[in-house]
């Protein structure tokens, strides 16, 4: 099968995307597919029209590959691809929209506020009064923890919002949930083993903890009571279903000291690097990396 792998682009997550792309390329070639690597730019529609592949593997991260626009282009061109469709991709990529959906569906998620400009300190004080301290400040449509800050004082919030605004026109100011970080991956609706993420030498699961070797420890199964784990998995499953995701998808959950799960977000194009969580969850379920890649392709073509 002739497969085009899209990786790179000009996203802040470009380097992660390139690593994912190379990992997918190696797996596809091992499986016997003919692979063309494309670093997409403005000429992508023309390139795909002139040399249409049998399948497009999206290994992009960030808004360039996850906000539904690329999915819409591929649908228009009639080219099958991995991951969720236009609507689910757009909802999951926009953290404000997805948070509103979670609230409407009764899915537990941390309280939040939204900023579109650098706030005054008085506004920051009101946020902290409502949300507590600290808060997590993040771009509304970013990933890989790029532009994310934990702010503990009102005076720190303007700079945190200013940083996040470099990556998104909207910024989410979110209640910080202490406790454990859990991620749950689904493969075509099948719940894969949950993973607990324990950052090493860091306050939270930042970019280095995600992608640097040794940046975090992953525990399978998580160190949770059975009923708490079940509640966490159920919340993650409901979030993925609410978004309308398909294929391989991952939901991130915080579990507070009282054992209550809080859904943070849904990722419709999980990373596929050597340290990525979704492939690790698949491996724990007995599905190796090449099998995972082929299964995603086969299901996308059904």
Curated annotation (Swiss-Prot):
- According to its UniProt record, this protein's enzyme class is ligase
Cross-referenced Pfam families, in alphabetical order? Dala_Dala_lig_C (PF07478), Dala_Dala_lig_N (PF01820)
Task: Show where the ATP-grasp domain sits.
Answer: 99-298
Q: Which InterPro entries match?
A: ATP-grasp, ATP_grasp_subdomain_1, D-Ala_lig_Van_CS, D_ala_D_ala, Dala_Dala_lig_C, Dala_Dala_lig_N, PreATP-grasp_dom_sf
Keywords of the record: ATP-binding, Cell shape, Cell wall biogenesis/degradation, Cytoplasm, Ligase, Magnesium, Manganese, Metal-binding, Nucleotide-binding, Peptidoglycan synthesis
Q: How is the cofactor bound?
A: Binds 2 magnesium or manganese ions per subunit.
Keyword Kinase found: no
Mind telling me which Gene3D superfamilies this protein's record contains?
3.40.50.20, ATP-grasp fold, A domain, ATP-grasp fold, B domain
Which compartment or compartments is the protein found in? Cytoplasm
KW Phosphoprotein (keyword) present: no
Q: Please, one GO biological process term?
A: regulation of cell shape
Describe the task this protein carries out.
Cell wall formation.
Instruction: Output this protein's name.
Output: D-alanine--D-alanine ligase
Its source organism is Gloeobacter violaceus (strain ATCC 29082 / PCC 7421)
Upper taxonomic classification of the species?
Bacteria, Bacillati, Cyanobacteriota, Cyanophyceae, Gloeobacterales
What gene is this protein translated from?
A: ddl
């Amino acid at each position: 099968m002739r497969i085009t792998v899209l990786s790179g682009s000009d996203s802040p997550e470009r380097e992660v995307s390139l690593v994912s792309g190379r990992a997918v390329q190696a797996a596809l070639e091992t499986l016997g597919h003919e692979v063309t690597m494309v670093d997409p730019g403005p000429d992508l529609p023309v390139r795909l029209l002139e040399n249409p592949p049998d399948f497009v593997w999206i290994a992009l991260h960030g808004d360039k590959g996850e906000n539904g626009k690329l999915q819409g282009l591929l649908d228009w061109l009639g080219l099958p691809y991995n991951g969720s469709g236009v609507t689910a991709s757009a909802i999951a990529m926009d953290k404000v929209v997805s948070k509103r959906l979670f609230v409407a569906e009764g899915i537990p998620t941390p309280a939040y506020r939204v900023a579109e400009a650098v706030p005054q300190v008085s506004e920051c004080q009101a946020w902290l009064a409502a949300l507590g301290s600290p808060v997590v400040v993040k771009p509304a449509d970013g990933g890989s923890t790029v532009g994310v800050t934990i702010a503990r004082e009102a005076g720190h919030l303007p700079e945190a919002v200013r940083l996040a605004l470099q990556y998104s026109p909207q910024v989410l100011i979110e209640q910080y949930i202490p406790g454990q970080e859990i991620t749950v991956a689904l493969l075509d609706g099948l719940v894969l083993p949950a993973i607990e993420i324990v950052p090493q030498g860091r306050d939270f699961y930042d970019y280095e903890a995600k992608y640097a070797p040794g940046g975090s420890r992953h525990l399978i199964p998580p160190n949770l009571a059975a009923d708490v784990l079940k509640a966490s998995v159920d919340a993650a499953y409901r979030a993925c279903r609410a978004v309308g995701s398909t294929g391989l998808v991952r939901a991130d959950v915080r579990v507070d000291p009282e054992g209550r799960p809080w859904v943070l977000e849904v990722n419709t194009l999980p990373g596929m690097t050597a340290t990525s969580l979704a492939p690790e969850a698949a491996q724990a379920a007995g599905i190796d990396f090449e099998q995972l890649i082929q299964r995603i392709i086969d299901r996308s073509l059904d």
